[in-house]
Amino acid sequence: MATVPTRSGSPRQLTTKQTGDAWEAQARRWLEGKGLRFIAANVNERGGEIDLIMREGRTTVFIEVRYRRSALYGGAAASVTRSKQHKLLQTARLWLARHNGSFDTVDCRFDVVAFTGNEVEWIKDAFNDHS
């Protein structure tokens, strides 16, 4: 877990949520620098969550952000399991339906932004509903 200095000068541990939020904010800024436009963050639908929803041209991009300190156990990208992919697909399906869309009517893709140590990897179209 990351640490941050406090007013007293002694560092305190960030919660897992705070650490995740910080990496998601960094991913958002990085992707905006690449030309994507922000739509929403931390979208919850029936037990699933999508970290970021952005737009690249006419494509709606659902983004999973992952961070790992090292690649010792496969790195950040490897942590997006089939089970997690299924949950992201279901959450996106529900979000699209709530916005009068579907995978059939909206051009969309699923990306992963993986931070492993100081390295960033952007995996466009990492998986889809046909995977």
Curated annotation (Swiss-Prot):
Disordered: annotated span: 1-21
Pfam families with a match to the protein in the record: UPF0102
CDD domains tied to this protein: PoNe_Nuclease
Gene3D superfamilies: 3.40.1350.10
Signal peptide as annotated in the record: none
Disulfide-bond pairs as recorded: none
Domain of life: Bacteria
GO terms assigned for molecular function: nucleic acid binding
Polar residues composition-biased segments: 1-19
PANTHER family with a match to the protein in the record: UPF0102 PROTEIN YRAN
Annotated family: Belongs to the UPF0102 family.
Entry-linked HAMAP family: UPF0102 (MF_00048)
NCBIfam families: PRK12497.1-3, YraN family protein
Annotated protein name in UniProt: UPF0102 protein YraN
Gene that this polypeptide is encoded by: yraN
